[in-house]
Amino acid sequence: LLTMYSNNPSEQDKPTIQNRHAMSLDNSQTIRSAFFISDGTAITAETLGRSILSQFASVPFETRVLPYVDTLERAEDAVAQINMAYQRDGLLPLVFDTIVNPEIREKVNSAKGCNLDMYEGLIGRIAEETGVEPDGHSGHAHDNVDSETYKERIDAVHFALDNDDGARTRHYSMADIILIGVSRSGKTPTSLYLALQFGIRAANYPLTEDDLYDNQLPKSLREHKDKLFGLLINTDRLVKIRQERRAGSRYSSYQQVQQEQRAIQGIYISQGIPSLDVSEMSVEEIATRILQMTGLKRRIG
């Protein structure tokens, strides 16, 4: 979430897998390549692109982010990567781009890919409707961000980091929300996303084995019960996540995870704590649902 976008494209093109669970359902499933390309940070192309790909959950995608493709030389490098993916996969890569410069966009579109231009169609339609031609420059989305919005965002991120994983509890009175759940249930990334995207001051606290089997909240949480929000995650999924961190341990065993899951659901019910099953949700979906369920108002955005 806090990745800084370098203006060197080679530092941003390491692939990641989206819809990874589709591979566990079908080992013979072909992994499809997808590229998010922009002459700016590529945040918009990546955010919209990943949202669209999430609608095809049965297809695993190997994704690459190529920001700052703002010269013909960099466009040619992007074309080479797309063509290489096509030769390797035998399938046209999906190419999501938000390139404003028509010459650079045309070069990228010359690659052997399924081009999904996110700007051209929209900009043309808006120009037709308003009678005003676009200025053709990238990056204006951030021109009018005022200093107060920036400060709110940074303050919220600092709060999330300072109050991560139950490290500090004395500032919980300043929190907008306190996420709770078992270890590795998605509390930290959700807290950071709430801070970064909405300016929400989110703390998070892991309920330990002792907390769970006492069937009561720790004292530091009882005092702020009205701010608590619980995360739940499917037992099978949580076992896989914990195995990646500590394979073969009691911590990652099915029996241990199942016991923790039952115990924490009991606490949520007995204490009247609102909760959400996040097993098949992206962090964006989790954060949005939390705002919807709690009525929290975003400070920015």
Stretch-by-stretch model annotation:
Residues A141, H224-E260:
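A glycine- and Lys/Arg-enriched "phosphate-lid" helix/loop adjacent to the NTP-binding pocket
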Residues V65-I82, V95-T98:
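Metallocofactor- and cofactor-centric catalytic cores in central/energy metabolism, strongly enriched
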Residues Y5-S6, I17-I52:
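N-terminal accessory targeting/assembly segments
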Residues N115-D165:
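Hydrophobic alpha-helical segments and helix pairs
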